[in-house]
């Protein structure tokens, strides 16, 4: 991907997408860019999403060290784990899991990273996620029992998801339309002028 096509992305997004570890580190050290900034022109991807897409394990560790949140999602609810699963980046999934990222989070359509890996035929990722998902759930339960906070919620996504849900026609409306079509055209009921 050319940097010219990413003109609206932050310098950090650009450096991560280009795979320039040294520049990423320099930008983070200087505090020039927010590691959690969502680029609306790229479906709300953060630098961490780009690192997962590109399979850049060291960049992921660096971003998280500087405060990047693995729970942040794109405009359709994809976490960095979804992108890693799609591309078959097993080491990225392992790194995210080791950092206690919620690798079992569903997107807007209910697809988890494991389901994405299944769709794209990433068998090694599927096998790993089948073992890792219960561990992720166990960690979540243990943290809850101990009263430890977990960073698994994207507050912006909660509002955006509700907006998306409201913008889609409801299932009942779709069913009513299907039923009307299957019955054929309806005739107006005019019982007043009709002889019995």
From Swiss-Prot:
Residues 187-196 have a biased composition (Polar residues). Coiled coil: none annotated. Residues 152-196 are annotated as: Disordered. It holds the Pfam family Ank_2. SMART domains: ANK (SM00248). ANK repeats lie at residues 7-37, 43-72, 76-105. Keywords: ANK repeat, Repeat. PANTHER family: ANK_REP_REGION DOMAIN-CONTAINING PROTEIN, ANKYRIN REPEAT DOMAIN-CONTAINING PROTEIN 66. This is Ankyrin repeat domain-containing protein 66. The gene is ANKRD66.
